[in-house]
């Protein structure tokens, strides 16, 4: 990034966690601007809006509007219900919606003995979540992508079975 965008402004979501800003500054970006939740900035003919979800470990989604095309990149943010409806109402119709369909976290690797409320992730949960999200957004094009993990230690290699691919997602949705 720093090779191609040296001296350029970088815009990131404003959230309580300063990690993104610190990481960007650590690789040499000097002009890092944090955009508050639901506020927009125009960069030439491109309008950018961040939506932040969570209190301490913020998930962010970004809406990019340009030339009559609207892109919603939800990444792995857990947006649903009224907040998602508001985004679609404020920016819709959505042409391209991007969202993760596969988990990349450690929750599958542990159990909490005696805690009946603890639920480990399952592959179908992420497929179902992707479908519900796209049903709510109704984009012209749904773009699945996978967060990823790769467990290499013998004690946890079995958890690689939680990885899913877009073909499996398609089969689930159909």
Give the predicted meaning of each segment.
Residues 2-6, 67-79, 108-119:
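Short, charged N-terminal helix-start/capping segments
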